[in-house]
């Protein structure tokens, strides 16, 4: 059942600020690049200091849960007070159970484990190219397959350059594999992580989920399923 939320009243100063869609888009792109860069650098540094992929993922889940789970609980409070059955996972996720599991597996568990494991084999420079660089490729292919989106000629040329860049970065590591190198393993893991995130993005777009609620669902799934598993396995 869809939840009708009252519009949030923004402060007067914020309402008075007017930005063009281009400005908002450019600012969002810059912030996204900074977040991706920070994620890659911190993950690589954590891997080089002896933390296992499960350890890094555990820290990621705890940090996100501390912020998003109380927010999700507050977000669904009006519906609960109205006697509506909302969300799943004991009120931690704002989405129904099935999409919560789907988003949690693709955008949460698999993505994190594949990406963090890749840092144990390949340098951060490879991750910065292969993970965010492959996202447009995977997303376009999945959107064409499941959403029936058309691929223009200009877009196809751009995707071709992405493939060329991935080959230039990952091809050298494949050649080094004959000499016992293991960088190629990390490269493949980075590409697989990008595929998981692209699958999550296309699924969210296909079902029209709100980005904030989808992120909350990822966190709720990881908190309920991954944290107990980590405690049992690692202690």
Summary of predicted features, one role per range:
Residues 3-59, 175-206, 221-228:
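Glycine-/small-residue-enriched transmembrane alpha-helix faces in small-molecule transporters
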Residues 25-30, 96-104, 151-163, 209-220:
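Cytoplasmic-side transmembrane-helix entry/capping segments in multi-pass membrane proteins
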Residues 111-116, 167-179, 223-235:
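Hydrophobic alpha-helical transmembrane segments in multi-pass integral membrane proteins
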Residues 28, 34-35, 63, 106-110, ...:
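Hydrophobic residues within membrane-embedded alpha-helical segments of Major Facilitator Superfamily
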Residues 68, 154-173, 219, 223-226:
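Hydrophobic transmembrane alpha-helices of multi-pass small-molecule transport proteins
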Residues 55-66, 115-150, 193:
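Specific alpha-helical transmembrane segments that line the substrate/conduction pathway
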Residues 35-40, 73-80, 86-131, 140, ...:
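Specific transmembrane alpha-helical segments of multi-pass solute transporters/efflux pumps
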